[in-house]
Design a protein with these regions (language model features):
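Short alpha-helical transmembrane segments in multi-pass integral membrane proteins
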Residues: 1-15, 70-137, 181-236, 294-359, ...
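Transmembrane helical elements of multi-pass membrane transporters/channels
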Residues: 10-29, 133, 144, 167, ...
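Helix-terminus/linker motif at the lipid-water interface of multi-pass membrane proteins
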Residues: 24-43, 112-121, 177-184, 244-274, ...
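Small-residue-rich hydrophobic transmembrane alpha-helices
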Residues: 42-102, 144-153, 157, 268-326, ...
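Short runs within selected transmembrane alpha-helices of multi-pass transporters and secretion channels
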Residues: 63-67, 133-152, 160-171, 189-204, ...
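Flexible, glycine-/charge-rich segments associated with ATP-binding catalytic modules
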Residues: 441-459, 560-580
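Conserved short strand/loop->alpha-helix "switch" segment adjacent to the catalytic nucleotide/phosphoryl-transfer site
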Residues: 476-497
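Glycine-rich/acidic phosphate-handling loop/turn and adjacent ATP-lid/helix
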Residues: 527-552
Length: 580
């Protein structure tokens, strides 16, 4: 369990960074244009968000369902099928990206007229410039997200995090250069975003995706599968419906604030939505860690580890949500000034508005996470419920509020309706559960599965010889209690002893505070043993035959089915023994 937590943390950071990359880049763009162009330029950058939300429909439809299923097949050690899902997803995203890039360029005027309350003002002019450039680079954005996701599910989250860090730094550097020093205004900010996405695509392509380091081969035409596409779309349609509602929600938010709260209100909303988008994307990153790490654990039939991942993800999400809300509430005045508020009246108004609006964050993060938890469980009925409930509650509140309450109090509608949506989600989940006590409320995770009916042993062992030999005694006692031949139990213990010794010697664990996790499952047709460690990459199966020691020769002679993977920064060795 210790290494399950470590894998979760490792993936969570990388996934959160990759999902937040766009929101962080928008925040950087906003600060730069707000300070070096005008506050109206910041509002224009924020008005790009409905289109950005629309792009998430493509990711939810074609990328995330494919990655969750690929993660499951990687867990089952079926790399060919994982490659088929990824290749199918990539070809679909390439087609969608080309079409959307062309459409964004051609229909820029239509978008500006639709989204701006005053389509002849300064905000509309800034938005026209920003949208035409960034929208034309839609394909680059989709590819950057695709490559980050694939690197993460292939067990290299640190590489994805590195790519995102480089991308954000490039965006900051080119934002300052093009916008502040060369005076290109919002056009410079938009070009900096395209450059950052290009850097991400090139870096990940050259360092992992199309190299031998990738554990599966991507051949978009050879491995394209109609059946895989149908499976992706079946799951993706339920998820993408949620993004449609989210896009409508963002449109209504911008329209309502423009109508009720004038330019200062739109400026305050722009800052609030930047923080909101970063936090929601953080929750998406946590959710993707549930889908990928959890999907991998489900493939291994490790339900104990899966429940641990889900519980931890909920705690982390709520902690981040409340921490951000408290921090923004405390530093709202400084935040408003940082984004370029230039009069005392504007600072005072935006500070008060932001302190109320920000409490939408904890509820919205939990709502986002719940969608991914339902996706990981393949619960098609509940996948759309969280975001649809949230969007409908917010839209209804924003449209009705001015008729019953003063317009200046509109900001209170955001957190109150977000809380209402949590209640709606819980109510719907209880209706779907229909009194079934075998699954948990809200998350719908099974309290018990058929996979857990088999006898199994889970151990976390400190990487030292004393604890190693004590654990071998525990394993031997467990095997002796099972209805198997004594010889088979001795063979498994002998193999595990050899593996532990090799891990300590070659993976650099001994005396350094490391550990390894061991799972032994008494399955119907044999014994499955999984050994995980967090040392440096070490594959005993890759040792040349003439260089193998006696212990390794014995291990490979006794156990005919041995598989090695390096996933999420950990060595994973899987041994299968037949009862025959």
């Amino acid at each position: 369990m210790a290494l399950t937590t470590k894998a979760m943390n490792s993936f969570l950071v990388a996934a959160a960074l990759s999902t937040c990359a766009t929101a962080v880049n928008v925040a950087v763009d906003g600060i730069i244009v707000g300070r070096f162009v005008s506050p109206d330029a910041l509002s224009a950058v924020n008005l790009y968000s409905p289109y950005a939300q629309t792009l998430s429909i493509i990711l939810l439809l074609l990328l995330y369902p494919a990655s969750s299923q690929a993660a499951y097949f990687i867990g089952e050690r079926n790399r060919e099928k994982a490659g088929s899902y990824i290749s199918t997803s990539l070809l679909s995203i390439l087609v969608a990206g080309v079409l959307l890039s062309a459409a964004a360029f051609v229909f820029t005027d239509s978008y500006v007229n639709m989204i701006c309350y005053d389509d002849d003002g300064a905000i509309a002019l800034y938005l026209h410039t920003y949208f035409r450039i960034v929208g034309s680079g839609t394909l680059l954005f989709l590819l950057a997200q695709f490559f980050c996701e694939i690197v993460n599910i292939d067990g290299r989250p640190s590489l994805g995090a590195r790519a995102i860090a480089i991308s954000v730094l490039c965006n900051i550097a080119f934002d300052i250069l093009l916008t502040a020093h060369l005076g290109l205004g919002v056009a410079g900010s938009a070009m900096a975003t395209l450059i950052a996405n290009t850097v991400t695509v090139v870096f990940l392509s050259c360092s992992h995706i199309f190299t031998k380091a990738c554990s599966f081969t991507i051949r978009i035409f050879h491995q394209f599968s109609v059946s895989a596409l149908k499976s992706i779309l079946k799951l993706g349609v339920n998820m993408s419906v949620t993004s449609v509602f989210s896009a409508v929600f963002i449109f209504v938010v911008n329209f309502s604030v423009q109508k009720c709260c004038d330019e200062d209100g739109l400026f305050a909303l722009s800052i609030g939505m930047i923080v909101f988008n970063i936090c929601v994307n953080l929750a998406m990153g946590v959710g993707r860690s549930v889908v990928s790490v959890g999907g991998f654990l489900k493939g291994l039939r490790d339900w104990l580890g899966y429940r641990h991942v889900v519980t931890r993800s909920i705690r982390v999400t709520l902690l981040i949500g409340f921490a951000v809300s408290i921090a923004v509430m405390s530093g709202a005045r400084l935040l408003v000034r940082t984004f370029g508020a230039d009069t005392p009246e504007m600072v005072a108004y935006c500070t008060d508005a932001l302190r109320v609006f920000i409490w939408i964050v904890p509820s919205s993060m939990l709502v986002t996470l719940m969608m991914f938890i339902y996706q990981a469980m393949m619960n098609l009925r509940l996948i759309p419920v969280p975001t649809v409930a949230f969007s409908i509650a917010e839209i209804a509140a924003l449209l009705a509020w001015p008729y019953f309450m003063p317009s200046e109090t509109l900001w209170y509608a955001f957190p109150l309706s977000a809380l209402l949506s949590i209640g709606i989600i819980y109510l719907v989940s209880e209706i779907v559960r229909h009194g079934d006590n075998t699954i948990s409320g809200l998350t719908h995770i099974p309290g018990h599965t058929d996979d857990e009916d088999v006898e199994q042993l889970h151990l976390s062992i400190p990487a030292n010889k004393d604890d190693m030999y004590l654990s071998l005694k525990s394993i031997r006692a467990f095997l002796d209690s099972q209805d198997i031949s004594g010889g088979l139990g001795k063979k498994l213990v002998l193999c595990l002893e050899e593996i532990f010794l090799n891990i300590n010697e070659y993976a650099g664990l001994m005396g350094k505070g490391h550990c390894y996790d061991v799972i032994i499952r008494m399955e119907r047709d044999g014994i499955l043993s999984v050994v995980k460690d967090d040392g440096r990459p070490f594959n005993p199966l890759a040792v040349e035959e003439k260089k193998r020691g006696l212990g390794l020769e014995i291990l490979l002679g006794i156990c005919k089915h041995v598989d090695y993977q390096n996933m999420y920064g950990q060595n994973l060795l899987i041994l299968q023994f037949s009862y025959e």
